[in-house]
Structure formats: C-alpha cells, structure tokens
C-alpha cells in the first residue's frame, strides 16, 4: 500500500480545525506543529497562531487541572497521616508531571526553533514571547528546587522581552498586550509570591487601557474588555487576599488572540 501524501499547509490547518471540533486536542497539536515547522520563510497567520495556541492550551490545561486536583488530595491525605496513600498519590502525580514536562518542552522547542526567530511584526513577537513565558510558568508551577528556579527565571526573561516590545509597539488596549499583563501579574503573584508587584502591574495595565477605551476598534473590543474584566477580578481577589486568605480561582488570559489561559 502506498504511503499517503504529505498534507499541504492548508490541509493541516483544516485538519486542526476538524480535530478542534472533535475535541481531539493532541491531534490538533500535531497538525499545527506541522504548520509551524513550515514558517521559516513566512510567519503563521493570525488564525494559524491562534489554532496552535488553542491546541496546546487545551492539552496542557487538562493536565494542569489534574495536577491541582491530585495535589489537593495529597495534602488532605498528608494531614490525615495516611502515608501509604501518599506514596501512591506521589507516584501518580509524578506521571502527570512527566506529561506536563513533555508538553511544555514540545512547544518551547517549537517557539525557539521556528516561531520566535521567524516573527517580524511586533504583535506576533509579543504573542510568541508571551507564550514562551506561559509555558515556562507552567513548568514552574510543579517543578521544585533548581528546576523551579530555572523555570521561573526563564519565565521572567520571556515576559520581560514581550513587555518591552508591547509597551513600545502596541496600544494599551491591545488584547495581546493586556493578556501579557494579566499572565505576567499572575506569575508575580503565584510563582514569585509578590502580591504587591502583581497588583501594581495589573492595575497599571487596567488604568492605561481604561484611559484609551474610546480608541478601541470594534473587532478587538470584546477581547480587550474581557481581559480588562479578568484583570479587575484578580485585583479584587488579590487585594482582599493581602488582608485575608482568599482561595478563589486566579484568572489568566483566555485562549485565542490574546494568547492563552486556563
């Protein structure tokens, strides 16, 4: 039987959309990785980069949710002194962490080898550097010791590089700039345990966007105002958390044009 012909770029994009409709996100990642590896000469379109982002976000999101649930159960069993169960849970958590590491390594390699070097427009540079920061942050969520320190440092470098371009080149209301501010502030809060810096970054991004709200184009109005609402939600949560220990869910940038999210 003859080998099936390689799919064209357009066919891979179409297959990725099919996989998304079928909620087969691992395959969606595979199709979009093939597309991403063709971008040495030309950048991904906005649609293509959003498909790539959504694919990876769903694949990583399922594991991050699993890890949080298992870690929560582990803490409960530890507090009850159930050592035998804790041993089982730790092994199972390790399996999830191996999957998380593999997914993060996959997208980070793709970003470093193809997507970041091929990007020329400020918008796409910020998008990919933010994505790089996001996936290093996901590593920092579960790594420990020197590995956690390295992941946190790499997150900071990527977010800072994205921020430098965003502040210089994108308007304060741009959904990608807002999504970056949202996720960068989450990094300060969750990974670096710096609530003051998290609040300052989120508040500044929100205030700057509010002051230019009348300049928003119709197409990005919905995306921008959604992220502004998430910034405000986190600020409310964090300012109350500084005085009392709030345990509500911290918001990240949604999937799609603004980048990624939970």
From Swiss-Prot:
Q: What protein family is recorded?
A: Belongs to the 14-3-3 family.
The source's domain of life comes to: Eukaryota
The stated induction of this gene product is:
By wounding, drought and salt stresses, benzothiadiazole (BTH), ethephon, methyl jasmonate (MeJa), hydrogen peroxide, abscisic acid (ABA) and incompatible and compatible races of rice blast fungus (M.grisea) and rice bacterial blight (X.oryzae).
Please report any disulfide bonds recorded for this protein chain, giving both cysteine positions.
none
Query: What Pfam families would the database entry show?
Result: 14-3-3
Q: What does this protein do?
A: Is associated with a DNA binding complex that binds to the G box, a well-characterized cis-acting DNA regulatory element found in plant genes.
List, alphabetically, the Gene3D superfamilies matched: 14-3-3 domain (1.20.190.20)
Q: What is this protein called?
A: 14-3-3-like protein GF14-E
